[in-house]
Amino acid sequence: MAGVVRLTTTSVQAIRVSSSFSSFATALNPLQPCLPPNSNLNSDKRLRLLSSSPSCSSSHYHPSSGLGSHLPLRRPKSQVVRVKVDENVAETEPPKWWERNAPNMVDIHSTEEFLSALSGAGERLVIVEFYGTWCASCRALFPKLCKTAVEHPDIVFLKVNFDENKPMCKSLNVRVLPFFHFYRGADGQLESFSCSLAKVKKAISVSPFPQLELGITLQTKRTTSLFFFDRIYQIL
């Protein structure tokens, strides 16, 4: 009987120890939310499961509380930088073909700007190009015109967009593109012709600047000048 009593006492102690371990395991369970309920897994497998579990990959451990809290991960800084770079690239697009001017080329956007540019040129030779952004011949000729402008820095080149200045262009009888006008000081318009860069170079080289005559008499030039400004002021 004494042996039975001792066995019973040992069984009770074993049950208490088992209960204590169960309580301790239950207490640890919140600290390991990613572990599966299988208690036969060794510690290495538990660690691998813990690191590869989706819920653990988005958790952050807080030492102060001893618990893992599920917080959203911050977006990497590299993505933010990439967005800013793309925005800067969009803001700095290369200029259109008609915007690539030589230093002595001026864009004209109105009749007032046109008259002001002619007046400010003084006795310098002024070459006016009438063009269209949609004109294939204008686009093909433009790089050569820019080169000519660089080779003659004393000449003023004015660029008139036909679509932006239709009333003025029509009053000047500009009916084909590209079209060129030559002006100089009080002499007014000296010459006008369409398209050919060879004509532009020939007109420049006919006589040394500033005595550019182009085969036009002084009386003809004065008449042309007065007629031109009368037509311009009718637009205003």
Curated annotation (Swiss-Prot):
Keywords: Chloroplast, Disulfide bond, Electron transport, Plastid, Redox-active center, Transit peptide, Transport. It holds the Pfam family Thioredoxin. GO terms for cellular component: chloroplast. Its main location: plastid. Gene3D superfamilies: Glutaredoxin. Residues 1-82 form a transit peptide. Residues 83-220 form the Thioredoxin domain. One of its GO terms (molecular function) is oxidoreductase activity, acting on a sulfur group of donors, disulfide as acceptor. The active site is at 135 (nucleophile), 138 (nucleophile). It is found in: Plastid, Chloroplast. Disulfide bonds join 135-138. PANTHER family: THIOREDOXIN, MITOCHONDRIAL, THIOREDOXIN-LIKE 2-2, CHLOROPLASTIC. Belongs to the thioredoxin family. Thiol-disulfide oxidoreductase that may participate in various redox reactions. Possesses insulin disulfide bonds reducing activity. This is Thioredoxin-like 2-2, chloroplastic. It comes from Arabidopsis thaliana (Mouse-ear cress).
